[in-house]
Amino acid sequence: MEQQSLNPEPQQGDLNWRLSAHPITLLCFLGFRTSALLMYLFGVLFIKNFILVFIITLLLLAADFYYLKNIAGRRLVGLRWWNEVNVASGDSHWVFESSDPTTRRIAATDKRFFWLSLYVTPALWVGLAILAIIRLSSVIWLSLVAIALILTITNTLAFSRCDRFSQASTFANRALTGGIVNNIAGGLLGRLFK
């Protein structure tokens, strides 16, 4: 009789950073996400200077925004976004870019970590904003939470739109490619049997 182990082997898609295709990118991504929250929550306990805690938290939020937008999104899920401004008209529009699904395989673990963290972090900041309002704490703390909300929600909305755009363009490409192949094949077969 075989003895079954109590610890099953980790499967791709489990929340285990060792299964990541890009473990360093994933750990840096999660590190920036959690360090800003931890500095906001516990910074005053370790650093007595409020201004220093505010500045460090703000720098961690900016680093998280930059790293997620320019590095983690591209490496972990193959998505990237940016905002372009037309100099002549002053209009701005968002540009979304995704890797080709036929040439790049996204690891299920990376995808789960990315999307879970992307949606959980703004929810945590919303909870902290509600607590700051209820406690009637300093306006400066509330302003820091507002900045955190703006940065995290911007990335969340942009990557959600980018993912939707990516799925739609993949569907359109498959339909277009399939339609072209069917038209060519139908045309050739039609000519052969005329």
UniProtKB/Swiss-Prot annotation:
Pfam families: DUF846. It is a multi-pass membrane protein. PANTHER family: GOLGI APPARATUS MEMBRANE PROTEIN TVP23. This is Golgi apparatus membrane protein tvp23. Golgi membrane protein involved in vesicular trafficking. The keyword Membrane applies. One of its GO terms (cellular component) is Golgi membrane. GO terms for biological process: protein secretion; vesicle-mediated transport. It comes from the Eukaryota. The chain crosses the membrane at residues 19-39, 41-61, 114-134, 139-159. InterPro entries: TVP23-like. Belongs to the TVP23 family. Keywords: Golgi apparatus, Membrane, Transmembrane, Transmembrane helix. Its main location: Golgi. It is found in: Golgi apparatus membrane.
